[in-house]
């Protein structure tokens, strides 16, 4: 099986058994292997495979055909271990991944944080990472005419996030 599919669909142990030195530098269908590992639906395997690839020096400043960076992909998953997701976000941002990257539908990675199915309290580690960055965009309209701030205002369980976002208006 192709290493990109293993990174996307399989558990960490199977990925390691299929991995060959240098795979972290190869592109599959024009995309970094990190795009595949970060889209793995198993949160534990997503973290372990991505951590392994980052430790191997995989390139992080990459954009896919939809204009998404690695933060868009990671944060668009539905199931998370928030501690691990926060660690990966921190590493990606430290490695230069842009928190304000707009995809082709003008969505910011922050919009995915707003939409996560977790409480403000559970998402606090992500909020801490996000709002210690400079120039956090909260008022950029997506293709549907909504900003992350407007989306958060409509959600009754985003009071803490909303308070932080209003400081960036």
Per-range role (PLM):
Residues 47, 63, 67-69, 75-93, ...:
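Eukaryotic tandem repeat interaction scaffolds
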């Amino acid at each position: 099986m192709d290493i990109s599919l293993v990174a996307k669909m399989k558990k960490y142990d199977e990925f390691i058994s299929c991995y060959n030195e240098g795979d972290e530098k190869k592109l599959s269908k024009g995309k970094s292997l990190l795009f595949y590992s970060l889209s793995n639906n198993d949160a534990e395997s997503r973290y372990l495979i991505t951590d392994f690839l980052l430790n191997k020096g995989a390139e992080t400043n990459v954009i896919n055909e939809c204009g998404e960076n690695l933060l868009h992909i990671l944060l668009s998953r539905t199931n998370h271990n928030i501690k691990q997701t926060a660690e990966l976000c921190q590493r990606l941002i430290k490695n230069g991944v842009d928190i304000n990257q707009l995809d082709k539908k003008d969505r910011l990675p922050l919009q995915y944080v707003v939409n996560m199915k977790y409480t403000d309290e559970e998402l606090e580690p992500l909020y801490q990472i996000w709002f210690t960055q400079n120039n956090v965009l909260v008022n950029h309209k997506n293709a549907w005419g909504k900003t992350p701030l407007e989306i958060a205002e409509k959600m009754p369980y985003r009071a803490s996030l909303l308070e932080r976002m209003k400081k960036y208006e």
